[in-house]
């Protein structure tokens, strides 16, 4: 900066990505901000996120089902359908990011770090997590019923040449409920590691295109790997029940949704949030100290930036 210039260069904003310490601070602030919303606002944001998951799971199911045509399936199996399904589904997370919607699985990381840093109380933590989970369920299942089911897009056909979309969803649902409890928990852990990393990428990468690509491939990885995501499964398995696929309520809710919920929570709150808190907890303390003085220029700049971002939410 030249002497006497009224313009200053923000050492944070000129970078396209944050440091590891800055990313953690952003994660805590992001989680802390969620506790400030009233219940109805949290619920509306969570329902919207559930709808977005339903919208893109519907599109993914249709796209994958078209490649599940019985003659094609004889040669390539489910591989082509899985590729197309995984390539379509990440759009849901980009919609959630763009609209500021609230997804339970991402909250397992962000809000947990805020809890560990004592920026939210246990009661606030439980309120945010329970409302986000309930709202996601309402949004995903409502879309499954009012759009996917009532439209007849996944209905069963007697003619095998027209039954590939139903068969694709049926086979996915059967596979999901066939896991043992422990297997499902493990697959859910793998899933939410990717989802929470996608959230972390959003908080770390400032370049728009870089952020989109990072989120896209993180979500694509879990979708094509056959991992278990609680909100996506709420849509898929409840739709399978509605169209009378070869699953029942016990298999859906006890054999899949319960262990998936446990595994997703373990991944975000224990596998990721706890180590990050242990590594960077002092960085957040330093960040808080710089709010009142100019001790560390980088953290001071981040403090100003985070406060400006918070005031805009």
From Swiss-Prot:
Full protein name: Formate-nitrite transporter
Q: Name one GO molecular function term.
A: high-affinity secondary active nitrite transmembrane transporter activity
Q: How does it assemble?
A: Homopentamer.
InterPro entries annotated for this entry? Aquaporin-like, For/NO2_transpt, For/NO2_transpt_CS
| A single cellular component GO annotation | vacuolar membrane
Residues exposed to the Cytoplasmic side:
1-46, 99-127, 206-210, 278-313
> How is the activity of this protein regulated?
Inhibited by the Malaria Box compound MMV007839 and its derivatives BH296 and BH267.meta.
Please report the organism this UniProt entry assigns to the protein.
Answer: Plasmodium vivax
Query: Looking at the record, which segments are called Disordered?
Result: 290-313
**Record function comment:** Monocarboxylate-proton symporter that mediates the efflux of the waste product lactate in the intraerythrocytic parasites; active in acidic-to-neutral pH range. Transports L-lactate.
Q: Which keywords accompany this UniProt record?
A: Cell membrane, Membrane, Transmembrane, Transmembrane helix, Transport, Vacuole
Q: How does it sit in the membrane?
A: Multi-pass membrane protein
Composition bias (Polar residues) maps to 298-313
Just give the chief location class.
membrane
Gene Ontology terms describing biological process:
nitrite transport
> PANTHER family, from UniProt?
FORMATE TRANSPORTER-RELATED, FORMATE_NITRATE FAMILY TRANSPORTER (EUROFUNG)
Q: List membrane-spanning regions.
A: 47-67, 78-98, 128-148, 185-205, 211-231, 257-277
Record's signal peptide? none
Q: Which family does it belong to?
A: Belongs to the FNT transporter (TC 1.A.16) family.
The listed locations are: Cell membrane; Vacuole membrane
Question: Which Pfam families did the record assign?
Answer: Form_Nir_trans (PF01226)
